[in-house]
């Protein structure tokens, strides 16, 4: 074996260079996203930035200008990338996701577990937002008491109904309010009465794409179905159960026993609203923003109502969903601070003149489009929020 003598000074230089290289690479691994620009401002890259010219892009540019004027230590860097499962995890592993990115409730827990979202708890408290948040919504984006996402939209599924068809079927109370099916069996009875009285499908249940499974989830839960259970460090599918079979049997009976579904049972997200919006179906499981989905079918807002979802034999439950902003796990403390400040420009519990102007403009636009605006959706903020109080008062005032 041959040994080569290396000059001590040269060895020291090589070791120093090696240490510096490791240090630099380590820094890249910790945070591959540039923290500051040439002017020393903290960079906040924001995903889902509109790429096409138009109102949406202009609104974002205006918001960006206001933010940078009011927060001179930060600069917004637009990023056109939007969340999708095919690209997210590869980009996240490489530290290539923007500082602020958006996704939905269904992806949050997996992203948190993978470690790709920053802990926002301290910053939310520092900026006075934590105690103003709706605790039910906050639970969805939390793990071990820490918050890893900023929920900005939330909904719960309820039961939409056609007022005119309910009236024709004798399903209205003397005070003009609708009778409400207390459980799924009574919903089937209501649907039968409606079809006999009007010839129209009493109930609409989607089956195509991923919508059928989404809507079926709340029905199955109410029958006592557990879709998965934790088995050690893994999750095990458990929906192959008598409870799930019973829930599926109810859906089958709607078609073959009660005959209250539309003749076309291949119904996706768009088709369900088309069926309801054109008066071809009387009831539909939907979220509170459903009236906006039927506006293109010229349905009179006075004909649309929302009520709570019926209970099942085991539970009275519904499904909650929504959208969130997450902050990259590569974000520095300054970037987390700036990210929350940026998000707050559009979603704040505080009642500002800008918020008033935006809400009034939004609701008046929806009224012009003949949309129903009386339905109050689930909110990120608790009932003590001044912004929520204003929004509810405005809806009550302009109710159509």
Functional labels for PLM-detected ranges:
Residues 186-193, 233-265, 309:
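Glycine-centered hinge/linker elements that transmit conformational signals in sensory
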Residues 104-158, 167, 185-190, 198, ...:
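Hinge/lid segment of periplasmic solute-binding proteins
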Residues 383-400:
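C-terminal capping/gating helix-and-loop segments adjacent to ligand/active sites or protein-protein/ligand interfaces
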Residues 74, 92-103, 116-118, 199-201, ...:
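Alpha-to-beta junction loops
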Residues 42, 65, 69-70, 75, ...:
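Extracytoplasmic/periplasmic substrate-recognition and gating elements
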Residues 79-88, 106, 182-186, 263-278:
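Short helix-initiation/N-cap motifs at beta->coil->alpha
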Residues 118-133, 176-180, 203, 225-248, ...:
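Short, solvent-exposed loop/beta-turn-alpha elements that line the ligand-binding surface or hinge
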Residues 2-17, 21-114, 125-131, 173, ...:
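Conserved N-terminal structural module of periplasmic/extracytoplasmic solute-binding proteins
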């Amino acid at each position: 074996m041959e040994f080569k003598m290396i000059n001590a000074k040269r060895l020291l230089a090589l070791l120093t260079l090696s240490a510096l290289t490791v240090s630099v690479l380590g820094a890249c691994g910790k945070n591959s996203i540039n923290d500051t620009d040439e002017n020393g401002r903290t960079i906040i890259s924001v995903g889902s930035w509109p790429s096409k010219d138009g109102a949406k892009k202009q609104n974002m540019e205006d918001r960006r200008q206001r933010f940078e004027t009011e927060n001179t230590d930060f600069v917004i860097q637009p990023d056109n990338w939007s969340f999708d499962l095919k690209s997210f995890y590869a980009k996240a592993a490489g530290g290539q996701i923007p500082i602020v990115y958006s996704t939905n409730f269904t992806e949050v827990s997996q992203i948190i577990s993978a470690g790709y979202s920053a802990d926002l708890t301290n910053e939310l408290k520092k900026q006075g937002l934590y105690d103003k948040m709706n605790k039910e919504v906050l639970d969805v984006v939390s793990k071990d008491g820490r918050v890893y996402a900023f929920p900005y939209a939330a909904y719960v599924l309820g039961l939409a109904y056609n007022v005119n068809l309910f009236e024709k079927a004798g399903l209205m109370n003397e005070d003009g309010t609708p009778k409400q099916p207390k459980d799924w069996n009574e919903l089937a009875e209501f649907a039968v009465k409606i079809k006999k009285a009007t010839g129209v499908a009493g109930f609409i249940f989607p089956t195509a794409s991923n919508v059928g499974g989404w809507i079926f989830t709340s029905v199955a839960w109410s029958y006592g179905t557990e879709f998965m259970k934790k088995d050690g460090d893994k999750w095990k599918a458990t929906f192959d159960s008598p409870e799930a079979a019973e829930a599926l049997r109810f859906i089958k009976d709607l078609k073959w026993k009660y005959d209250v579904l539309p003749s076309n049972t291949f119904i996706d997200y768009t088709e369900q609203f088309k069926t309801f919006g054109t008066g071809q179906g009387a009831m539909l499981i939907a979220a509170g923003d459903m009236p906006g989905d039927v506006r293109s079918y010229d349905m009179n807002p006075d004909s649309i109502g929302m009520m709570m979802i019926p209970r099942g034999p085991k539970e009275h439950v519904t499904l909650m969903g929504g959208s969130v902003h997450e902050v990259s796990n590569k974000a520095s403390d300054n970037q987390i601070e700036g990210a929350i400040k940026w998000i707050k420009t559009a979603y704040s519990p505080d009642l500002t003149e800008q918020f008033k102007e935006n809400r009034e403009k939004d609701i008046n636009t929806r009224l012009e489009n003949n949309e129903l605006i009386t339905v109050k959706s689930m909110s990120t903020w608790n009932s003590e929020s001044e912004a929520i109080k204003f929004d509810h008062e405005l809806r009550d005032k302009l109710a159509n």
